Amino acid sequence: MAGRDPRDRAPRVRNRAPAAVQITAEQLLREAQERQEPTIQAPKQRVQDLEELSEFQARKRTEFESRIRYSRDSILAWTKYAQWEASQNEYERSRSVFERALDVDPRSVDLWIKYTDMELKARNINHARNLFDRAITLLPRVDALWYKYVYLEELLLNVSGARQIFERWMQWEPNDKAWQSYIKLEERYNELDRASAIYERWIACRPIPKNWVAWAKFEEDRGQPDKAREVFQTALEFFGDEEEQVEKAQSVFAAFARMETRLKEFERARVIYKFALARLPRSKSASLYAQYTKFEKQHGDRAGVELTVLGKRRIQYEEELAYDPTNYDAWFSLARLEEDAYRADREDGEDVEPMRVREVYERAVANVPPALEKRYWRRYIYLWLQYAAFEEIDTKDYDRARDVYKAAVKLVPHKTFTFAKLWLAYAYFEIRRLDVSAARKVLGAGIGMCPKPKLFTGYIELEMRLREFDRVRTLYEKFLTYDPSLSSAWIQWTQVESAVEDFERVRAIFELAVQQSLDMPEIVWKAYIDFEAGEGERERARNLYERLLERTSHVKVWISYALMEIATLGGGEDEDGNEIEGEAGDADLARKVFERGYKDLRAKGEKEDRAVLLESWKSFEQEHGDEEMLAKVEDMLPTTRKRWRKAEDGSGELEEYWDLVFPDDEKEANPTSFKFFQAAQAWAQQRAGQGEEGGLSYDLPSDSESENEDEDGDNREEEGMDQD
């Protein structure tokens, strides 16, 4: 690299602008082509006399002989040599070369074909025939030689000779294409009987469904439908009735049915389809069934179409279940499909047995979920319920339906979980059979094995329908002994006692309920208070509120307490339909409740609850109070202020938040700033009220006004405006 001359480097292009004249790739190629030097061509030699010809031929033969001497196994060299001799009209020499080549490789198909082509070009027909005889004798499994031989004879209009060649060929039992060529030869010369005989020999040699169908189609096309039926019947007898053979012969059945359809023999076609489908499993006859469905849609009645669609869907569901036997959705679909088919047959007046439906249900319930988890059993249990409903409603086999319920109950692992819907369905089945004692035994057994709220509730609902109130009370006692924390159960029991107007028992039940550790005690207290309020017992309701406030001082309790004091209790209608006026409420008592609630929430520092209480108090004063009390409450309403506090993540940074600021809290925390703030607020309101033309008052409020500003802030502002 160090010794390279710097002048050898390519010049650096300084001007990168495009040239004025652009040169295309096409121009470059054209110039390159034009500048190429002409290739050297060998001089042409002309043969002037026989002596020169002999010399030329001798030289060429020497070259060919030298070439085949060094590459004796090269068939291409032998072929070129022989073809050159033939081009010199030296056919004897050409034959000699071909024979010498055949001695080297007598099984070269290409060599035989080139040899025969040479004889045919020289119009030596007999020589070519002799060569074809030798070739097919030596190579009988090479179809190309047979085809060329037959083509030669037919080209010479020697049909009998071509037939003889085919006969020799058929003795070797060639492939189907050879048989078809023989048949087409006979068809070209209208020898249909001979062609039919060839079909028969072909079938004897290769009895596969495709060949049977081709033979029958040939007979149909030449106007022999009876012969075509005979062919199909022979084929079906040959294949037999075994499942494996029928599966193999599906194409024969389909072609047979299509032929009958073309001949307008629809009943024959339907029988053929049904015969084949009855001997094949659904999973192996999808294609045949699709053709049958299409046939019924075109030529069948409504019942036939429905039957085919039913079968097609049945195959689909069976395939899904074969892949996953625990696919209960597929079992449901298959069971409903069979039920619909059973009902349709009964509506048509047919005497059918429900065996297929029962078989589906038995197969379905045999696939028990693999895990003892309720989520896997939910869909499975519905199979049993649907099975029992089918036996009860459709077949009217009540004993079998009872057996289904018993089997389902026995199968469920009740120690782990149970299904109340199963027990209740079983019990209501016994009720429909007018056996109340059996229904009670079923539900009692369910509660004894695995008690659960839904089972108790269903049993109680049953007894309520039967108007057995003593049994209902007993069941509620057992229910609440099992789980005394269920608030809904206590409330339902009181509703039952209220319906029979046993109010003392209702109060006793409520008293027991509020003493328990309930899951939702608030709804029990609310129901208790609503009951007393509904009966017009204001004092009892007031006592309940006081007891509840001892347990919790939630803002909703205070609001509800206050609204109870203002509400009218005990109204309604008597037995004669006359309206009874209730006891009117007392607004002062309600206001005192609001004040108590506000003070209690303020003491506990519940700002949001105080704001909610004040909003309810404001609504109360708007409806039941006067302007003075409304103004007082409005002065107590909080305002929102933006404040800062340290972040909770411990980073020391300040974060912004909105806080509720109550006037009484501000006054108590900083009286001086509160007075100033009140004065500024009054000044702002005064300025907004008077506009630019009015004068402004800078008088601070007096001490007496300051003391009462929580009560009459708005009145103070009005007085200040009047003084101005």
From Swiss-Prot:
Presence of keyword Nucleus: yes
Acidic residues compositional bias, start-end: 702-724
Subcellular location: Nucleus
Region called Disordered, residue ranges: 681-724
InterPro entries named in the record: HAT (IPR003107), HAT_Syf1-like_N (IPR055433), HAT_Syf1_CNRKL1_C (IPR055430), Syf1-like (IPR045075), TPR-like_helical_dom_sf (IPR011990), TPR_rpt (IPR019734)
Cellular component GO terms, alphabetical: post-mRNA release spliceosomal complex; precatalytic spliceosome; Prp19 complex; U2-type catalytic step 2 spliceosome
A biological process from GO: spliceosomal complex assembly
HAT repeats mapped onto the chain: 55-87, 89-121, 123-155, 157-188, 190-221, 223-262, 264-298, 308-340, 352-386, 396-432, 434-465, 467-499, 501-534, 536-567, 585-626, 635-667
Main localization (coarse): nucleus
Lineage: superkingdom: Eukaryota
Record bears the keyword Nucleus: yes
Record text on subunit structure and interactions: Associated with the spliceosome.
Functional note: Involved in pre-mRNA splicing and cell cycle progression. Required for the spliceosome assembly and initiation of the DNA replication.
Similarity comment: family membership: Belongs to the crooked-neck family.
Protein name: Pre-mRNA-splicing factor CLF1
Organism: Cryptococcus neoformans var. grubii serotype A (strain H99 / ATCC 208821 / CBS 10515 / FGSC 9487) (Filobasidiella neoformans var. grubii)
